[in-house]
UniProtKB/Swiss-Prot annotation:
The gene is kup1. This is Probable potassium transport system protein Kup 1. Keywords: Cell membrane, Ion transport, Membrane, Potassium, Potassium transport, Symport, Transmembrane, Transmembrane helix, Transport. Belongs to the HAK/KUP transporter (TC 2.A.72) family. GO terms for molecular function: potassium ion transmembrane transporter activity; symporter activity. It comes from Lactobacillus johnsonii (strain CNCM I-12250 / La1 / NCC 533).
């Protein structure tokens, strides 16, 4: 750990990291050993070699994939403090165009996992309540239906508090998760003391031996259950922008030790209870290692930890979606910043979609055992894609070719093995995660390549120099042959390099129907890295009625363009930059600012567009997604302003020329007589 990273570590930061980042991997003990034993036919079909080998596989999987690959390597690959597969892609995308594919596939897989993690963890924890007596023989949670109802209520509450932001949530969750990991370690240690020979699992020999052992009925496919122990490693990388690299590195050793002790404790309990019979068929060694007199309190704590586990994926999903939108993988969405840190975000639409998908999964699968079959597959895919991108990042950083290839071969082999093992769950529920990932991936593919085709095929004169049209706009402003469209005609249009603007904007003013206005405003909104910036700059091109406004707004500042622009007009009138706009008819005496009309231009594919059918489909699908997902008036704070949405033709590629020939009058008369004779034309 370098000096800079060490300085960024604080007690509060460590607590927030434990509360936000480790929830997913921290609840793995709830279901990993349960899944492993069930996959081998139950507790009656396991022996010492199987348990020691299984725990060895778990520990070394977490060591290699979480500690080595994620904490020691991936956390170094951050983009301005942000982590995750999209941030990694941003660092390496100039090395090869095809690298966009692993980024799209991996990102879609992680977002799909965000719907499964809350469902699995919360359901597993609540299932621990089944059969627990409250008072004198009262068993309120006796059926799976009750478990599902409680799970759905908890999930609804979880998603409803997301608007509070990760800072507030982390402060509340951090101490609880610290207690949770301490509890895992203490309970595990208490059981482990009954048979310290379980520490043989630290030797990787037993892990490799189990893969080829006749006692292992699942064979190599046992890795599908083993991999569940490291789900959540991707959250460490995705959430680095929320809590900081130093706090993740500083807190991981404690978390890893506590997890290891709990797995050891569960292993010893299984070895000491070979004839255990759950009676009702519900067997979970995690709850069995807990003394009966504190089991109810432990289940409550496990439920809270499960809720926090879901938080890691939800916050990670917000970060990934924001990055995807910036990379033009996804449409623009309304992003909110609950705190003064730009890395901590909340996206209402994403929150609603994940909530709906998670609850649907709970209602569809009904039990945690069924959900576990769907869990993990999408994450193995994302980890393989991350490995490919990390290989490119290491090469970019100048790592020796031999070491770089060793990294790719070693971790690529591990990822492929876990992915193949997880594919064995496909027909038992794994298809659900792939369907969700596929749906997200298709949207990303359409949006990204639709934009690429549009940019490539768009006419070279798509952008024009605004300053070359200043005289024309000034003349139109004073031309009384045209009715006044508005006193202030405002276009929400980006002006690049202070002079280039899309031709469609000027087409809207001059060609569709000349729009006469006293002043033409072209407004560009620039979001800064500071939370509360509110500044502007103007360029009038030497006129008093053509104004290019560059707004610089902090990421927490409301984008109320309507309000800001009125203040800007007052400022410019006061210093003589533009002329006063006195109003004869007004409810405000002395008002010197006229009315505003805001115009937002939307593209429509022109029939004249010449593209290959596949390209045209992608561009049309991209435009459809834009119209479905966007609300520009809301983005710019124009909900209650006079806003006009205009559609202009988007002509891509070579234009299709359609010719019509004029015929002489005599020929027309001959055609007319012929049609009348045939009865096709009546007098």
């Amino acid at each position: 750990m370098n000096e800079k990273t060490r300085k960024n570590i604080s007690a509060a930061g460590l607590l927030i990291a434990i509360g936000i980042v480790y929830g997913d991997i921290g609840t793995s003990p709830l279901y990993v050993m349960k899944s492993i034993v069930a996959g081998n036919g139950g507790i009656a079909n396991v022996n010492r070699d199987f348990i020691v080998g299984s725990i060895s596989l778990v520990l070394w999987t977490v060591t290699l994939l979480t500690t080595l690959q994620t904490v020691f390597i991936a956390l170094k690959a951050t983009n301005h403090g942000e982590g995750g597969i999209f941030a990694l892609y941003t660092l390496v995308r100039k090395r090869a165009k095809w690298l966009v594919l692993p980024a799209l596939i991996g990102g879609a897989a992680i977002l799909a996992d965000g719907t499964l993690t809350p469902a699995v963890t919360v359901t597993t924890a609540i299932e621990g309540l089944k059969g627990i007596e409250f008072g004198h023989g009262n068993v309120p949670v006796s059926t799976q239906g009750t478990v599902i109802a409680i799970t759905v209520v908890i999930l609804l509450l979880l998603f409803s508090i997301q608007r509070m932001g990760t800072s507030i949530i982390g402060k509340a969750f951090g101490p609880i998760m610290f207690i949770w990991f301490t509890f895992l370690g203490v309970i595990g240690l208490m059981n482990m003391m009954g048979d310290l020979s379980i520490l043989q699992a630290l030797n990787p020999y037993y892990a490799i031996k189990l893969l080829f052992s006749p006692y292992n009925k699942a064979g190599i496919f046992i890795l599908g259950s083993i991999f569940l122990a490291t789900t959540g490693a991707e959250a460490l990388y995705s959430d680095v922008g929320h809590v900081g690299k130093g706090n993740i590195i500083g807190s991981w050793p404690y978390v890893f030790v506590c997890l290891s002790l709990n797995y050891f404790g569960q292993g010893v309990w299984i070895l000491n209870n070979p004839n255990y019979n759950a009676g009702n068929g519900d067997f979970n060694p995690f709850f069995e290692i807990i003394p009966q007199n504190i089991r109810l309190a432990a289940i409550v704590l496990a439920t809270i930890a499960a809720v926090i586990a879901s938080q890691a994926l939800i916050t990670g999903s917000f970060t990934l979606v924001a990055e995807a939108s910036g990379l033009k993988f996804l449409p623009r969405m309304n992003i909110m910043y609950p705190s003064t840190k730009k890395g901590q975000i909340y996206i209402p639409s994403v929150n609603k979609m994940i909530c709906a998908a998670t609850i649907a999964i709970v209602l569809f699968f009904q039990t945690s055992a069924h959900m576990e079959a769907a869990y993990g597959l999408s994450i193995t895919i994302s980890m393989l894609m991350t490995t490919i991108l990390l290989y490119e990042w290491l090469a970019m950083k100048g790592v020796h070719t031999i070491w770089n290839w060793l990294f790719l071969i070693f971790f690529g082999f591990l990822d492929v093995m876990f992915m193949l093992a997880s594919l064995s769950k496909f027909m038992h529920g794994g298809y659900v995660s792939l369907v969700i990932a596929g749906f997200i991936g298709i949207i990303m593919y359409v949006w990204y390549y639709g934009n690429k085709i549009r940019d490539k095929r768009e006419s070279r004169n798509a952008y024009v120099r605004l300053d070359e049209y200043v005289d024309m706009l000034t003349n139109l402003s004073h031309d009384e042959d045209y009715p006044t469209f508005a006193t202030n005609l405002v276009y929400m249009a980006k002006v690049k390099y202070n002079k280039f603007i899309k031709r469609e904007i000027l087409y809207s003013i001059l060609d569709k129907r000349p729009k006469r206005a006293r002043a033409y405003w072209f407004v560009t909104v620039n979001v800064t890295n500071e939370p509360f910036t509110a500044e502007y700059a103007v360029n009038t091109y030497g006129t008093k009625n053509v104004i290019n406004v560059q707004l610089f707004l902090g990421f927490k500042q409301q984008t109320s363009v309507n309000v800001y622009l009125r203040q800007i007009v007052h400022d410019l009138i006061a210093d003589g930059t533009i002329e006063s706009q006195p109003q004869e008819y007004t409810t405000t005496p002395g008002r010197d600012v006229g009315d505003f009309s805001f115009v937002i231009v939307n593209d429509v594919i022109s029939p004249q567009t010449q593209l290959r059918s596949y390209e045209k489909f992608l561009v049309e699908a991209r435009v459809w997604l834009q119209n479905l997902s966007s609300n520009p008036a809301s983005w710019f704070g124009l909900d209650y302003a006079d806003t006009v949405i205009e559609r202009v033709p988007l002509i891509l590629g070579n234009q299709r020329r359609q010719h019509i020939t004029r015929i002489p009058p005599k020929k027309f008369e001959d055609i007319k007589k012929k049609l009348q004779a045939e009865g096709e034309l009546k007098e």
